[in-house]
């Protein structure tokens, strides 16, 4: 008699995002638009970079479906697209992908959903082990009465969801 042991270790694709810092050039308060508008100057593009591991075969295929989206706890109340730059300022930020505003998942209230920045189907062939997603940040005025000079900062998390 003999013992036979079989092990199955499935390869599961994972993609880890790099940190991304987008720093906008300063803008004079006099050049900010009216409430409800994004500034048309000093926008800046950055690239979300995903580094993928465990791709299948020589064609670098993914083993499962992936979806990339952003989430934040710095969203303006009742908005899923405007990031507050500071609690006491009427200027924040808006992020865009392919020319359209990005809907971020609200970490404290996830009911409104989010924009999928990138979807990769299972068995997709990646030309490289990295995936790049361009994103543009702009100043956005949400309350003209509270606009003042000063530093602004907002944070969003890059999420990769697998199915």
PLM feature spans:
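Mature extracellular/passenger domains of Gram-negative fimbrial/pilin and adhesin proteins
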Residues: 1-163
